[in-house]
Curated annotation (Swiss-Prot):
Record-given protein name: Kunitz-type U15-theraphotoxin-Hs1g
Organism: Cyriopagopus schmidti
Localization per record: Secreted
Propeptide segment residues: 28-33
Cross-referenced SUPFAM superfamilies: BPTI-like
InterPro entries noted in UniProt: Kunitz_BPTI, Kunitz_BPTI_sf, Prtase_inh_Kunz-CS, TFPI/VKTCI-like
Miscellaneous: Negative results: the recombinant protein does not show activity on Kv1.1/KCNA1, Kv1.2/KCNA2, Kv1.3/KCNA3, Kv2.1/KCNB1 and Kv4.3/KCND3 channels, as well as calcium (Cav) and sodium channels (Nav). It also does not show detectable activity against chymotrypsin, trypsin kallikrein, and thrombin.
Tissues in which the protein is found: Expressed by the venom gland.
Coiled-coil regions listed: none
Length: 88
């Protein structure tokens, strides 16, 4: 039973890394922290329907957020997105 539990843990860790690592590679870092404005849009894991805004590298764009999961490049309004991510 110990081997099966170990293999399950390894499989879970592998899946988490495959999901998380590409997003981290695409992000920009400032002072060792992820710049949330450089993250891709991410609708999350749930199936609800919330109109939100994300920064696409140039401007703020509307997208549908499912209500859970996702990343921090998600804002309730275009104004909030621009305030946080647009460079003067």
């Amino acid at each position: 039973m110990g081997t099966a539990r170990f293999l399950s843990a390894v499989l879970l860790l592998s899946v988490l890394l495959m999901v998380t690592f590409p997003a981290l590679l695409s992000a920009e870092y400032h002072d060792g922290r992820v710049d949330i404005c450089s993250l891709p849009s991410d609708s999350g894991d749930c199936l609800r329907f919330f109109e939100m805004w994300y920064f696409d590298g140039t401007t703020c764009t509307k997208f549908v957020y499912g209500g859970c999961g996702g990343n921090d490049n998600r804002f309730p309004t275009e104004k909030a997105c621009m305030k946080r991510c647009a460079k003067a």
